[in-house]
Amino acid sequence: MTGESSSETRSVTVSRVIEAPPERVYDAFLDPEMFASWYPPTGYTAEVHHLEPEVGGTYRMTFYGDADELADFEQSFGGTYRELSRGERIVYTDAFESDEPTMAGEMTVTITFVEVPDGTEVTVHQEGIPEAIPPSDANAGWTDSLGTLAEIVEDVDA
């Protein structure tokens, strides 16, 4: 697993090799039930309200805190799919639903899937991270989420 973050550009890049074929890993980003099962970082659960996996399609979801100290946490967000190439690349926008000025703005997330001898190298590049979120926290969140994704898709009979 590799990762880097930049406070200057408000961006992060995280990579991980997942022992599964690119198409299986790609599909886990676009299946609502599967996406909700791995995307929220530890301490959170997610509900996907809608997900239209087509160019120009939109998605909306909410993260909920599931631990005592996070019990009151609820954050909704969504965006639009800009590019979808099965097993190769996903590009989408992402924006939080918040009145807080430090949470404003649209992020762009680019995910690439490259077949490697051990499976698939997944690289996530997220840019335009809101002021309220330190890029190091976004990096940690993606690292955690990709770890959960690996557990789920690697545990499927090929």
Where does each model-flagged region fall?
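A generic structural micro-feature
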Residues: 6-8, 53, 71-75, 101-105, ...
